[in-house]
């Protein structure tokens, strides 16, 4: 089921990402990006131009995706309600607890984050990150 959702989601969001967005995208691996950066640095040197690079490391980025904002972004992107509804249902009523040395704490609702290891999460995160940039 997740593969079907992923294929449908990709159809909508691929045109939302700029060509320079490479993270979590098919055919845009790390090696290609390293070659691109190397070429840019080389050309800057040939033309004696300064070049500035900025690399971002999103620490625990998947953990901070706000669900309500994500649903709004999906709607603004024009993703059809049935697909958005399915995605919302995947995240509805999630709860967690922690086990400590003294037992477990009370259950609490999870309102942020995309699922770690889920094939939909990279696409959802990219859409969220592109929107907030």
Q: Which residues are covered by each model-predicted region?
A:
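Conserved pre-catalytic core of RNA-dependent polymerases
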Residues: 1-131
């Amino acid at each position: 089921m997740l593969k079907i959702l992923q294929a449908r989601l990709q159809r909508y969001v691929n045109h939302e990402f700029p060509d320079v967005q490479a993270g979590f995208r098919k055919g845009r691996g790390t090696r290609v990006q390293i070659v691109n950066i190397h070429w840019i640095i080389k050309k800057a040197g040939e033309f004696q131009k300064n070049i500035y690079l900025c690399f971002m490391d999103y620490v625990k980025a998947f953990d901070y995706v706000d669900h309500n904002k994500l649903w709004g972004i999906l709607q603004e992107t024009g993703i059809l309600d049935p697909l958005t509804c399915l995605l919302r249902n995947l995240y509805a009523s999630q709860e967690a607890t922690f086990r400590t040395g003294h037992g477990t704490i009370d259950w609490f609702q999870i309102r942020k984050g995309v699922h770690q290891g889920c094939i939909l999460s990279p696409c959802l995160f990219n859409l969220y990150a592109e929107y907030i940039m």
